[in-house]
């Protein structure tokens, strides 16, 4: 067993690859360390593709182990369960830059598993996870046109920061993840505080430049310990079949792409497919015909050639637009009467109903990850039901795509949200995609902005999002604004930008080809800004600023300040007192150790009742004041009475009546309601109560 180690300096951290000792039965296995953050990344590929396989079955699984941070998992089973949101998003982050680097036609199953085994809370796991995946694939022998590098870029005080620590990210105006090869950027994911397009592009180029040291190290690792490359070659294209398919239905497909309506267009394309299948596919009557799957692939190639060729030639796009025109937009707010905030955003054949719900601090989502537990007071949930694309399908818990799209939309609006001190609500936004033909995540950003403003959330500025596309051939390129679903599928780049009039708040880029230059990205960002500003103007027609007040059905907050030593009295034994207040008044109460009592109520009457109860509990005894009291216990020398919530005092036998009292039971009974006057408080805080002084 021989272990090989490759180390290099990456910014302020040392990165170390170890291979040859652990997980030796995997095709590729690398233990990657960045400081004290360490992951085991393994790659396994099936030597043969399954018969009839018509897609590339790549799966990436990023998983965090509690022991990596010296913790034991919670829950009854005390072991890791279903993937967390962070694990799902990181799996997607690894998948996106490596997927386009597998050769066309490669259909063998490949599985990547990245396991966090040691964690330094100040060093994130995303960069070592992507570098470890790149290294494991590079040495595995599996066909892979890598390696890739990865970096996280921060921005503070006009300077870019390479792979910032967790503390630095909290103070940064930017968190941008970028991955790419030695000569091309492949993936960007970012969240920003209204930064300019120039700063965003500069961050991408800075990250790509800095990651070259990692790419070079992985190339050296491959040269020294890489396994022999698999003997795999893509099947040769069937020119005869291609000619027959193209000749048979080219005119039909061209006519289909003159149809603006998506469903009508798909029907025309399906008719053309049926026509060519009937003519060329193998059947019992025609066993010499072609495989139906091969014919389907050729139809796809014809579709791609026609759509891309028209765009490069400067002809109108599928729905008749030029490259910069945005589809027609319709915006409405207040479409649902009993919710706290709602909006309907429609852009062409993409539509979202977005609903905002306001809650209290107790409604915040408790997140428990390797770094610890915290409460998240802003949630954005994206749902993509099958009917939105006219299909039947699974309905249930969200998939990876829905989680990813929801997080992208969340990043787009998060920087504009008020602080907890400015707006003490927990906020949940749900985006229901009711129609989809491209850019539903950006429709969610637009709908979220309007829904939040309608709910009375004081956003710093309205936010809009737009999806850009790219078609690039040897003869030229075209950047497309507000892409359709087909343009996303048939194009070379998916480029989503969210932001305000002032700047960018989120940027996501996935590039399927090499050769995307800085000039092309600059044009795309500039064109995206123009489109974003147009969309913001359309949104402003429905709602231009946040409503001044929240909905009447939303909770309202009232704050009462009490002395810290009174907190225990409000809570009561085992929480009995505070529970009785909430049950009797219908409010929600949150209280901290500093004496800040936050009351959430749906109306003033409930709030006032709760405040009155709290005032009673925390009130200080006043000498000379008459109180309504109840006899709690009778003793030989008097009676103990409850005269204030949580407070008891003694009425001495001499203070029960004007005459001499021989037997207290002749004058008082336990449970009897009486009036008493507080006559004095001694130095120990003990009160003197009198019945006869009333």
From Swiss-Prot:
UniProt keyword annotations, A-Z: Cytoplasm, Magnesium, Metal-binding, Nucleotidyltransferase, RNA-binding, Transferase
Enzyme Commission (EC) number: 2.7.7.8
PROSITE patterns linked to this entry: KH_TYPE_1 (PS50084), S1 (PS50126)
Cofactor: Mg(2+)
Gene Ontology CC entries for this record: cytosol
Catalytic reaction equation(s): RNA(n+1) + phosphate = RNA(n) + a ribonucleoside 5'-diphosphate
Compartments, record wording: Cytoplasm
GO MF assignments: 3'-5'-RNA exonuclease activity; magnesium ion binding; polyribonucleotide nucleotidyltransferase activity; RNA binding
Record-annotated KH domain positions: 555-614
Residue ranges occupied by any S1 motif domain in the UniProt entry: 624-692
InterPro entries membership: ExoRNase_PH_dom1 (IPR001247), ExoRNase_PH_dom2 (IPR015847), ExoRNase_PH_dom2_sf (IPR036345), KH_dom (IPR004087), KH_dom_type_1 (IPR004088), KH_dom_type_1_sf (IPR036612), NA-bd_OB-fold (IPR012340), PNPase (IPR012162)
SUPFAM superfamilies: Eukaryotic type KH-domain (KH-domain type I), Nucleic acid-binding proteins, Polynucleotide phosphorylase/guanosine pentaphosphate synthase (PNPase/GPSI), domain 3, Ribonuclease PH domain 2-like, Ribosomal protein S5 domain 2-like
Pfam families linked to this entry: KH_1, PNPase, RNase_PH, RNase_PH_C, S1
Function field: Involved in mRNA degradation. Catalyzes the phosphorolysis of single-stranded polyribonucleotides processively in the 3'- to 5'-direction.
Record-stated family: Belongs to the polyribonucleotide nucleotidyltransferase family.
Subunit record text: Component of the RNA degradosome, which is a multiprotein complex involved in RNA processing and mRNA degradation.
This protein's name: Polyribonucleotide nucleotidyltransferase
Lineage: Bacteria, Pseudomonadati, Pseudomonadota, Gammaproteobacteria, Thiotrichales
């Amino acid at each position: 067993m021989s272990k090989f180690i490759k180390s290099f300096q990456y910014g302020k951290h040392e990165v170390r690859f170890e291979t040859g000792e652990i997980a030796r039965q995997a095709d590729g296995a690398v233990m990657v360390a960045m400081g004290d953050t360490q992951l085991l990344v393994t790659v396994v590929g099936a030597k043969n593709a399954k018969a009839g396989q018509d897609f590339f079955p790549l799966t990436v699984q990023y998983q965090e182990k509690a022991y990596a941070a010296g913790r034991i998992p919670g829950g009854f089973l005390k072991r890791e369960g279903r993937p967390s949101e962070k694990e799902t998003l990181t799996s997607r982050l690894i998948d996106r830059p490596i997927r386009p680097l597998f050769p066309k036609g490669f259909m063998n199953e490949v599985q990547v598993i990245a396991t966090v085994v040691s964690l330094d809370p100040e060093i994130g796991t995303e960069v070592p996870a992507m570098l470890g995946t790149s290294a494991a694939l590079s040495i595995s022998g599996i066909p892979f046109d890598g390696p890739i590098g990865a970096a996280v870029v921060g921005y503070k005080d006009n300077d870019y920061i390479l792979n910032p620590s967790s503390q630095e990210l909290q103070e940064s105006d930017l968190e941008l993840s970028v991955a790419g090869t030695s000569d091309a950027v492949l993936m960007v994911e970012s969240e920003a505080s209204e930064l300019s397009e120039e700063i965003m592009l500069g961050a991408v180029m800075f990250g790509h430049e800095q990651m070259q040291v990692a790419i070079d190290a992985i190339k050296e690792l491959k040269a020294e310990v890489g396994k022999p490359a698999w003997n795999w070659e893509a099947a040769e294209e069937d020119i005869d079949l291609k000619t027959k398919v193209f000749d048979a239905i080219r005119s039909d497909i061209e006519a289909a792409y003159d149809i603006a309506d998506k469903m009508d267009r798909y029907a025309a394309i399906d008719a053309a497919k049926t026509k060519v299948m009937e003519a060329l596919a193998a059947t019992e009557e025609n066993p010499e015909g072609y495989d139906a799957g091969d014919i389907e692939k050729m139809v796809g190639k014809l579709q791609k050639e026609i759509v891309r060729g028209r765009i490069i030639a400067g002809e109108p796009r599928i729905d008749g637009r030029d490259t910069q025109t945005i589809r027609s937009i319709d915006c409405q707010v207040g479409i649902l009467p009993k919710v706290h905030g709602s909006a309907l955003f429609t852009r062409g054949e993409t539509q979202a109903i977005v609903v905002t719900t306001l809650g209290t601090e107790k409604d915040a989502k408790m997140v428990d990850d390797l770094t610890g537990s915290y409460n998240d007071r802003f949630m954005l949930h994206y749902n993509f039901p099958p009917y939105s694309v006219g299909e039947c399908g699974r309905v249930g818990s969200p998939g990876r795509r829905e989680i990813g799209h929801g997080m992208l939309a969340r990043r787009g609006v998060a920087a504009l949200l008020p602080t907890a001190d400015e707006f003490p609500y927990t906020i949940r936004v749900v985006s229901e995609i009711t129609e989809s033909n491209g850019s539903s995540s950006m429709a969610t950003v637009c709908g979220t902005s309007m829904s939040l403003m309608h709910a009375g959330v004081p956003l710093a500025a309205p936010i809009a999002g737009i999806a850009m596309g790219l078609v690039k051939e040897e003869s030229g390129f075209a950047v497309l604004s507000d892409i359709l679903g087909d343009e996303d599928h048939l194009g070379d780049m998916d480029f989503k930008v969210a932001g305000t009039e002032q700047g960018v708040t989120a940027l996501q880029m996935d590039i399927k080809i090499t050769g995307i230059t800085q000039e092309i990205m600059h044009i795309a960002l500039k064109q995206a800004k123009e489109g974003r500003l147009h969309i913001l103007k359309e949104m402003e027609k429905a709602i231009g600023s946040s409503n001044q007040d929240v909905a009447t059905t939303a909770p309202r907050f009232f704050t009462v300040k009490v002395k810290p030593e009174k907190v225990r009295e409000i809570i009561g034994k085992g929480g009995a007192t505070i529970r009785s207040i909430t049950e009797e008044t219908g409010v929600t109460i949150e209280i901290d150790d500093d004496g800040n009592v936050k009351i959430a109520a749906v109306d003033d009457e409930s709030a006032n009742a709760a405040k009155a109860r709290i005032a009673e509990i925390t009130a200080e005894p006043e000498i000379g004041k008459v109180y309504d009291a109840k006899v709690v216990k009778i003793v030989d020398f008097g009676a103990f009475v409850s005269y204030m919530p949580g407070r008891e005092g003694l009425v001495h036998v001499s203070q029960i009546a004007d005459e001499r009292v021989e037997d207290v039971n002749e004058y008082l009974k336990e449970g009897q309601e009486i009036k008493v006057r507080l006559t004095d408080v001694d130095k120990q805080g003990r009160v003197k109560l009198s019945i006869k002084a009333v």
